[in-house]
Amino acid sequence: MSKWATHAGGGDRKPTLLFVDYEVPQYDLYAGSRTNFMYLQLLAGMGLNVKFLPADFLRVEPYSSELNELGIETLDGPWFKENWEQWLTDNGQGIDYVFFNKPESATEFMTAIRNCTRAAIIYQCHDLHYLRLSRKAQVENDPAIQEEADRYEQMEDHIFSNSDVLLTFSQVEEKILREKFPNKKVFTVPLFFYQDLPHPDRDFSKRKGLLFVGACSHKPNRDAIAWFCDEVLPLVHRQIPEAVLNVVGAHAPAEITALDSDRVRIIGRVSDGELQVLYDSTKLVVVPTRYGAGVKGKVIEALYQGVPIVSTTIGLEGIVDVESLATPKDEAAGFAE
């Protein structure tokens, strides 16, 4: 990636990269937003002239100002909402790279960007949406969801066909993309970047409880919480009646908040500092994901924190050599054990 900062443009001009996402990354709410923020930090730190275009054109504080402090121009507000195509017409020839990572925003802006720029288009696949939806359809035995998956596959294939470079976090999805698009440049890249390593207290005899981390607005997370509480936790309580599950994640709907009890704490949104306290005191992170795609940020974060994990196969999918760190369990009895 370092060649991006030197191989475009000419003379002393910094190469310009336009980063397009559906909204300003709120990194303490969603794993995907944390990934986007880390990549924006990386790209700006490489010396690129980075411009950020949120598809909703909203300025969200403090996150927008934090991007500005990194030297990133944010193309937000009423003027850009009404005039983004004119801005592309006027400035497109100075854009060297365009970075997409969501199918909806790529679909909305890609044609205009192709018409107004000569930029190389990089698409970073957070996960294959069609694969996640197809797995959901299988779990729920719902043909309507499979129809939605088929629509997303057409959308994503069109985007991939019109991109110059494809990035993915998952080895599994890299293989799928290489098979479907053998002439494309496809690379697996890290989900998160960390500047240092934590030094947690390794005396797990002092720790207690279970921890689940994940935005409750994400349907696979809601399904995972419900399945764990309904099918797995009662089996755990037969052996460890005092076990408590802490659920961290913003935007919990009524179906999740209704699970709150002495044994299930629906904590909701927390700050990074509060989350660190939970990681430092928990005995085990659970990842009971039954359907999904891509690499799971909750798994990478737990590994970084040095906390043991119990996960399903889907939860561990796509991570290099993960079998040396955790053995997947897909049935309730095995997961509880």
Model-derived features: positions:
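Conserved catalytic-core segment of nucleotide-activated headgroup transferases in glycan assembly
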Residues: 28, 32-41, 52, 161, ...
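Short N-terminal targeting/anchoring amphipathic segment
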Residues: 88-107, 122
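Conserved acidic donor-binding segment of nucleotide-sugar-dependent glycosyltransferases
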Residues: 325-333
